[in-house]
């Protein structure tokens, strides 16, 4: 009897389960909603991830997956705070160019160049309909930041970006260039004379450790980007140039006030930091499209000055040394609304796969005066120049140490000076480029945004080449001094000095206890860890390293007795002898690195400083030191500077700069726009 009842019971349960499964139908899903939000990702209203200025343009996008391969998404609409968004929604399926894992019938719904004027927290909803009539919806949120009515508006914004420059890099440069006497600085760095300093949190949208692309774009878009992305939110396509865009500070101020944009760097101009002020791409390495966008979208950004390295992107592919190629370029479809709306609604250029384009000639045809070296830069009359293009190397410019040694005729290269080996012996210093940029931009009566980057503070910290990043920090500070002098006495210019992130976990561990001659002897002995034990002085043994500064503003030599000693926290394996490296590591961005004389340069961290036989085991994999997640200092000068105190997010910088440029400087009370605070419920 019990056995019979048990069988009936099991049959009854199985039947109920089967009936229940028939009642649960598959449904389409929304896997991404842009702008990004915690409301969409985790069901929490806070923290608010995306923030915008009133009227700042940005794209909306949703990725929608049907519940079966034989079904389609036939419509999608967006609404804001319960009201339908009337702007056209472009639908694109994933038959091609979507990321792995998305079915071919997945659909992207996009609204381009959307904006909201009303400040406050807004709820965004997307509703989609499947071919069988099923519907799906999802919601997220974003904030439009309130700007406070102030007094005088700032005309000019100068952003000085020391790539990878943390507090330790600033301190090291102060010790070398300024010197200490009984614990007091003898000559302060220019950046140390700014009246206001705060600390900046540097995380990107997808990591606590940012790279340079989102590190820069956070400052000039007000939003987090993924690593490797510039001025865009992430999406689900493989196209590097179709991502949802965010309007930059330069674009917003050019559109609303007519301001010009200047970009000055010691890197290749396609690099992350300069591009992160004017270019929209999810791939910081797509150089051909990046430099084309500089020129073709200058009507959006107001680009008037562009200086640095990177000539390889401006030469037709047939010219030796050119890096142009269709694989790093773009051409938007004129019939597919997904990209056609970038052209139609943003006013962006359509692009073209044109590896044989002579971009250098096109810049000149557009009215840019071109300079290829310091000598020609010096001859340019800024009173007669509205637009300036300077390209001083095929890729990254040589670093300050090698440029200074070149000017001093110090032979360190294979065929002469290092700058001779690279083929560009007459490169300007960063301060010389900055001076000319300011003189040209000063002609723009509606004002300007100027970004100046000390790029190889980061690049040489990656290589753990202490003296090279040290002198690049000094070079950067000389540019800071010029920017401060320009703003001094004016009431219309704000200057900020900061970094996108820290690089290499630089630690000032002390000073050498021996003379340079003794250090050389220890290296020749190949004494390994005994080298460290005799040389490294900590605490009072470090003393005060004393560098003699030449009339050009740089140390006469970096190989002094009792030198400063630097360690690295995010280091890869390396050989170390504590002396200045005669040559930099090979730069794989240079077109002729694998040819002599550049091929004779050290190929990596374990290929240099071998004589001393002292190897330091790294804490990170690979062959390079890495960025760190530590906060970085920000110093400010000029009207509105006092908004930059405290510990702030990197995206806050954008809104503080916008405040003084759009609504004017306000008193300390109520000066800083306060983001909307939303109660975050604990996760279940």
Regions from the language model: what does each represent?
Residues 94-101, 155, 162-217, 270-683:
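A post-motif C-terminal structural segment
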Residues 102-118, 144:
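Short, hydrophobic beta-strand segments
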Residues 58-68:
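Aromatic/hydrophobic beta-strand junction motif of beta-rich domains
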């Amino acid at each position: 009897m019990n056995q019979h009842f048990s069988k009936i019971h099991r049959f009854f349960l199985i039947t109920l389960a089967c009936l229940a499964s028939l009642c649960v139908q598959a449904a389409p899903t929304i896997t991404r909603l842009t702008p990004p939000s915690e409301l969409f990702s985790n069901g929490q209203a806070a923290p608010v991830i995306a923030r915008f200025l009133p009227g700042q343009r940005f794209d909306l996008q949703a990725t929608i997956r049907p519940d079966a391969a034989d079904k389609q998404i036939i419509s999608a609409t967006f609404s804001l705070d319960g009201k339908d968004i009337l702007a056209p929604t472009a639908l694109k399926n994933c038959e091609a160019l979507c990321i792995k894992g998305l079915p071919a019938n997945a659909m992207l719904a996009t609204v381009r160049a959307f904006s909201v004027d009303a400040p406050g927290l807004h709820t965004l909803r997307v509703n989609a309909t499947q071919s069988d009539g099923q519907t799906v919806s999802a919601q997220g949120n974003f904030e439009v930041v309130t700007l406070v009515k102030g007094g005088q508006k700032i005309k000019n914004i100068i952003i000085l970006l020391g790539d990878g420059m943390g507090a330790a890099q600033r301190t090291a440069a102060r010790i070398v260039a300024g010197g200490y006497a009984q614990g007091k600085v003898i000559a302060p760095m220019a950046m140390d004379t700014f009246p206001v300093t705060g600390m900046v949190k540097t995380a990107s949208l997808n990591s606590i450790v940012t790279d340079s692309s989102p590190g820069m774009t956070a400052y000039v878009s007000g939003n987090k980007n993924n690593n490797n992305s510039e001025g865009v939110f992430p999406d689900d396509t493989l196209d590097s140039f179709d991502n949802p865009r965010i309007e930059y500070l330069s674009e917003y101020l050019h559109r609303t006030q007519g301001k010009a944009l200047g970009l000055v760097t010691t890197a290749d101009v396609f690099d992350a930091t300069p591009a992160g002020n004017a270019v929209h791409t999810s791939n910081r390495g797509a150089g051909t499209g990046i430099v084309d966008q500089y020129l073709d979208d200058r009507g959006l950004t107001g680009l008037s000055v562009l200086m640095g390295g990177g000539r390889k992107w401006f030469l037709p592919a047939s010219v030796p040394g050119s890096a142009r190629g269709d694989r790093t370029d773009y051409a938007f479809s004129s019939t597919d609304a997904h990209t056609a709306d970038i052209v139609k609604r943003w006013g962006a250029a359509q692009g073209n796969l044109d590896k044989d384009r002579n971009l250098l000639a096109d810049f000149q045809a557009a009215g840019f005066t071109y300079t290829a070296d310091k000598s020609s830069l010096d001859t340019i009359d800024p009173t007669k120049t509205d637009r300036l293009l300077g390209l001083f190397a095929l890729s990254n410019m040589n670093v300050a140490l090698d440029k200074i040694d070149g000017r001093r005729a110090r032979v360190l290269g294979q065929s002469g000076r290092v700058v001779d080996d690279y083929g560009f012996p007459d490169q300007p210093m960063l301060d010389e480029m900055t001076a000319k940029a300011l003189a040209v931009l000063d002609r723009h009566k509606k004002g300007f945004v100027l970004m100046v980057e000390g790029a190889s503070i980061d690049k040489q910290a990656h290589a753990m080449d202490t003296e090279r990043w040290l002198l690049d920090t000094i070079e950067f500070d000389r540019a800071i001094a010029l920017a401060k002098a320009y703003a001094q006495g004016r009431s219309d210019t704000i200057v900020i000095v900061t970094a996108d992130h820290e690089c290499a976990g630089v630690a000032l561990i002390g000073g050498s206890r021996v003379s340079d001659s003794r250090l050389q002897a220890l290296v020749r002995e190949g004494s390994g860890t005994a080298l460290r034990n005799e040389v490294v002085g900590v605490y009072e043994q470090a003393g005060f390293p004393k560098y003699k500064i030449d009339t050009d503003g740089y140390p006469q030599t970096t190989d002094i007795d009792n030198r400063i000693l630097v360690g690295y926290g995010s280091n890869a394996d390396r050989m170390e002898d504590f002396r200045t490296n005669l040559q930099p590591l090979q730069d794989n961005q240079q077109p002729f690195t694998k040819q002599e004389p550049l091929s004779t340069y050290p190929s990596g961290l374990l290929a240099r400083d071998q004589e001393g036989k002292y190897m330091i085991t790294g804490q990170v994999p690979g062959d390079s030191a890495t960025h760190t997640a530590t906060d970085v200092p920000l110093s400010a000068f000029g009207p509105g500077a006092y908004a930059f105190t405290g510990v702030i997010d990197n995206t806050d910088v954008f809104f503080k700069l916008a405040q003084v440029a759009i609504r004017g400087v306000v008193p300390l009370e109520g000066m800083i726009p306060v983001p909307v605070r939303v109660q975050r419920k604990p996760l279940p």
